[in-house]
Amino acid sequence: KRGGAPAGDEPPRAGERLALVLEDEEDVRQTLCEQLHQLGWLTLETASGEEALQLLEASPDIALLISDLMLPGALSGADVIHTARRRFPALPVLLISGQDLRPAQNPALPEVEWLRKPFTRAQLAQALSAAYARI
């Protein structure tokens, strides 16, 4: 079962789940993956929206999608999230960006949990819990 949350809407425990990280800036992606590892997650990472969708199709173990909003290429982070939500409605999603992500400022954004960069590991952990609570 993809993306199912345990009782109490708490994220899975250490080493049990795999997160797909879609971020085009390598240093930001590495830092985010390090924070996820410290929180007990395994990670797959990519800078491409197209590759992220391929990985989601090919890897049923992915239990969380974290995507940057602004990406190079044809697909934005919002495009990837919209497609992923259609294909995998039970997959928790976290949208990250340096931009203001409040819905009033961005009515076209997908209705998912979001986190504004830069963020701390504690803020990331709280956002992950909130992303699981939305499913």
Summary of predicted features, one role per range:
Residues 119-132:
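C-terminal output helix
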Residues 30-38:
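Charged docking surfaces used in two-component/phosphorelay signaling
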Residues 45-64, 72, 104, 123:
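Acidic, metal-coordinating helix/loop segments flanking the phosphotransfer/catalytic sites
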